[in-house]
């Protein structure tokens, strides 16, 4: 088995696939890339059993063969090469020899047959959307997903497809984000929960991408195919909570304010808040928003006044500043609106501008009880 490939082209593809490989694997074979050569097409795969990702590369060869190559060793070697052709030759003594312009490097390989086979999706449904739209949907939601192993359904992002729109939801019970696109639809209704790891990989690869992504899915797995790459992952098993039920419908009190001004004020005041609750207080009266925090244990306190536009009754409401900061950071609008009903009901944060046609973002943040 022998092939010739550009060093930088191979490195670029392997760095993408390397994100799948865990630092410590129970199965040693998973520390490898699977190289499957079929004449001038080399398919490289990486897996952690839950997620498998593979790319098809163009190489110069007229051989066939399958080997598993140590991922970390190969990546470290490739990073040091300037652009040049590399020749890979599989020797009889169980090593693969790489020849560059200046030297030869031999590394031991494992039998490719030991590498776990990727799942074939049985009777999948499919939906196609632009890579950048998927990357944005992941970016806007994934930060709100939980980390609680006891509630695995909340540790992923809920994909909800219909013939009218595509909706992506994430929540950890303290905050919730719903991102909706009405400019993209599916041929039939479907819903599934995607784990964080494959989504993080997809987000990194697809940001700014103009190519289409085909999403195929059934009850247990999902497959994302784009350009020369495909990613297959196991879905999170379980039923997603009824998130619509927690979004308050009647919110008579509406605050509108410049996002950056609100964000920097919350960040500053939060420095003086209690280190366990991170509680800040919003007090709104007329066109004035008063943001304050106090850490009674250390006699630290801070207060800022901002002008805002507000319709509704004067009110005071407490929030965890970390959640509020995360959400404001994740929006890119100039102005935001915060809709509230009562101090013990969730606040709804939405961007006022800066959205594409057909793009809708709703963020929900649970209040914290104010100690008077």
Regions found by a protein language model. Name each.
Residues 1-372:
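Structural preference for solvent-exposed beta-strand-turn elements
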